[in-house]
């Protein structure tokens, strides 16, 4: 099978519990062209992370987590104590949790490196300026895959800065994995003021509100 050896997976989320045993350092035989402390040092001041803080680079944690940075606070603390959620730990674990003895929990690509980019602010919510700064650094760090389980509303944009960043991704070989969207404004043909699609115009583009009944869509 495929264990993820040589892959770099960026997780833009609430940060992670870096001391979790499933994120322990990878042994040398699991590494192939890895991100190293030196490779990040070499480009540190070209990264948005490096430009946002006067502190010396402390983004390297171990061979499993070669880059950790909190883009919301411009520091190196990516613990859940700031964002108040372990969502990022969960997502990172699904993607690349190490296989450890005595545990059945293992990621899809356990031999991959994780690039941890905390973008959520205290109390929840992530600003697009913060997200875009992290995404631009993904390109410079030459990651293979970016996961964005952000829960933002679905839709389209023509904001120049956002379009520019997205175009950089299109020009690269990076695979972007984005949540389908938790909600949106279904303005076309919906019930006035209720944001619910009519039967002849069903919502098929979202996996959350309003296509699925939940606490966020009490009215069906």
Regions inferred by a protein language model and the residue ranges of each:
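Substrate-binding/specificity loop regions of serine endopeptidase catalytic domains
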Residues: 81, 151-220
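Alpha-helical scaffolding within the catalytic cores
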Residues: 129-134, 213
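Subtilisin-like serine protease catalytic core
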Residues: 1-128, 141-144, 170-173, 186-188, ...
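Short, solvent-exposed loop/turn segments at secondary-structure boundaries
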Residues: 126-129, 157-159
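Short, well-structured alpha-helical segments in soluble
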Residues: 133-142
């Amino acid at each position: 099978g495929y264990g993820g050896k040589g892959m770099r997976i960026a997780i833009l989320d609430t940060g992670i519990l870096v001391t979790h045993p499933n994120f322990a350092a990878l042994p040398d035989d699991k590494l192939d062209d890895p991100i190293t402390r030196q490779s990040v040092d070499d480009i540190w001041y070209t990264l948005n992370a490096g430009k946002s803080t006067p502190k010396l680079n402390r983004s390297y944690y171990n061979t499993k987590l070669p880059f950790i940075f909190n883009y919301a606070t411009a520091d190196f603390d990516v613990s859940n104590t700031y964002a108040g959620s372990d969502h990022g730990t969960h997502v990172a674990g699904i993607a690349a949790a190490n296989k450890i003895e005595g545990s059945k929990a293992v990621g899809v690509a356990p031999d991959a490196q994780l690039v941890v980019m905390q973008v959520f602010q205290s109390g929840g919510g992530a600003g697009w300026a913060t997200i875009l700064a992290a995404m631009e650094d993904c390109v410079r760090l030459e990651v293979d895959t970016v996961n964005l389980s952000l829960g933002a509303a679905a839709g389209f944009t023509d904001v120049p800065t956002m379009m520019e960043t997205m175009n950089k991704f299109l020009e690269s070989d990076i695979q972007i994995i984005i949540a389908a969207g938790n909600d949106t404004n279904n303005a076309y043909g919906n019930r006035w003021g209720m944001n619910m699609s009519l039967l002849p115009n069903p919502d098929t583009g979202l996996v959350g509100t309003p296509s699925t009944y939940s606490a966020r869509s009490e009215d069906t």
